[in-house]
């Protein structure tokens, strides 16, 4: 079953993306390098729980 996750910028800008992942096949936390429009650079985004 796919679940929605929140990817938060490591640049501490408050910007985030939402994505889905299959937690049964990939139980580890996701870390992806994506563009942060606030700082206008590519930074690491880390998975956090959606409240």
Curated annotation (Swiss-Prot):
Signal peptide segment: none
A molecular-function term among this protein's GO annotations: structural constituent of ribosome
GO BP, sorted A to Z: translation
Domain of life: Bacteria
Keywords: Ribonucleoprotein, Ribosomal protein
Gene3D superfamilies membership: Ribosomal protein L33
Gene Ontology cellular component annotations, sorted alphabetically: cytosolic large ribosomal subunit
Any Pfam family the entry gives: Ribosomal_L33
Family recorded in the similarity comment: Belongs to the bacterial ribosomal protein bL33 family.
Protein name: Large ribosomal subunit protein bL33
Origin species: Vesicomyosocius okutanii subsp. Calyptogena okutanii (strain HA)
Source organism phylogeny: Bacteria, Pseudomonadati, Pseudomonadota, Gammaproteobacteria, Candidatus Pseudothioglobaceae
Gene label: rpmG
